[in-house]
């Protein structure tokens, strides 16, 4: 989910797509947010040679903590991240925290540190967003441009865990990717499958 959808689901904000409600939620992108959960790790998983935490989508500026150790900082919502957590996990309860920095504050830092001006889309509705000095910062963030406003949607500069987080463990090798291609020929379908394997060095 995202900060906005989680706040809606917990009845903290009203639907920002209704009427002019977007104007009432512009404070959200100026704050820092924290997600926290517990991972119960069994001995079977802990005994595996490889244990990785895979983040398929984090939007955008995050710090990932496992049992109070910062393992990674991110700044791009368009890519995935994989972290070796074998030496950071313990048997039983583990605490995973993801802290999200304000994309507006980060964007302002990057904008103000630049010694020259660059073109910025008029779709960046900084005025509605009540951004300091109406400064447009969309091009300084590796996140979806439409979050900053567009003619077809509201300005909702959100953050959050927008794709799955997966804890994976394995020995010796794993299936990294599977690609299946189908070709139809008359009354017959021919299916080709390519399977990519990753092996440990040993």
Regions found by a protein language model. Give the residues of each.
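Residue-level structural signal for beta-strand termini and adjacent loop
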Residues: 76, 179-180
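Beta-strand-rich binding/interaction modules
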Residues: 64-66, 188-202
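Accessory beta-strand-rich segments of carbohydrate-active enzymes
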Residues: 25, 29-174
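Surface-exposed, low-complexity/disordered Ser/Thr/Gly/Pro/Asn-rich loops and linkers
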Residues: 15-26
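Predominantly extracellular/luminal regions of secreted and cell-surface proteins
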Residues: 1-11, 158
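Short, solvent-exposed loop/linker segments at the N-terminal edge
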Residues: 181-189
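Generic recognition of flexible, low-complexity loop/linker segments
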Residues: 151-152, 180-181, 194-196
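Beta-rich accessory regions
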Residues: 44-45, 184-185, 199-201
